[in-house]
Amino acid sequence: GFVDSDDWIESDMYEFLYRLLKENGTDISICSHYRDKGGKSVAKYASGEQFVFTRDEGIRALAVDKHVRNYMVDKLFKRSLFAGIVFPVNRVFEDLAICYRVFYGAEKVVMQDTPKYHYMIREGSTMQSRYNPQKEYNLFQSVYEQVKFILEKGIWDKAGVYVMRRGIRLLDHTMMVEASISTDEVIRDVITKMHEFDYVGY
């Protein structure tokens, strides 16, 4: 399991995840999480409902990135799933860059909507800091790589829509910053990659 240095967990989180994994015979277990800000903890999913996914269902849920998020920190994994997998260096959103690869090695995944992880929202964090086109480009790259992997493995032929959506968002956001050579290069690369999915309806 993983815990970000800014965050904290309930004392029984790993016991909960381990029991969930063993009881369901899965390779990955997931809990939901709180978002902590200003001394308040808010959880979007806290019903206690349980879901068991096949490998492909779990990867599709990661691509949607709403219920099952591309976080490493709210999950417990069998160690063997990380064979041959290395976190990218000098790149933000590294969880998104590898989470789907770890899921690909699993047979089944279980999730229970019981929050056990506390994600701290602070000024200056990766997700909350002032807009940075390079960071959003890293996010786009990771989504693009995830979608290409999903398509190559025949997991979900509609996954390309998420490249289009993320690309449109990035292009829209670049309008907020002063033009530069690096920004122009990002825009060109994003548009080129988006054109690979011209067939997608969104």
What annotation goes with each model-predicted range?
Residues 115, 142-145, 167-170:
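Amphipathic, well-ordered alpha-helical segments in soluble domains
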Residues 141-162, 199-201:
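C-terminal, non-catalytic tails of nucleotide-sugar-dependent glycosyltransferases
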Residues 137:
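Contiguous mid-protein beta-loop-alpha structural module that forms a pocket-lining wall or clamp
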Residues 2-4:
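Ankyrin-repeat intra-repeat helix-capping/turn positions
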Residues 7-112, 120, 124-134:
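Donor-binding/catalytic cores of nucleotide-activated saccharide
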Residues 23, 180-202:
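Membrane-interface aromatic/basic loop that binds lipid-linked glycans or pyrophosphate carriers
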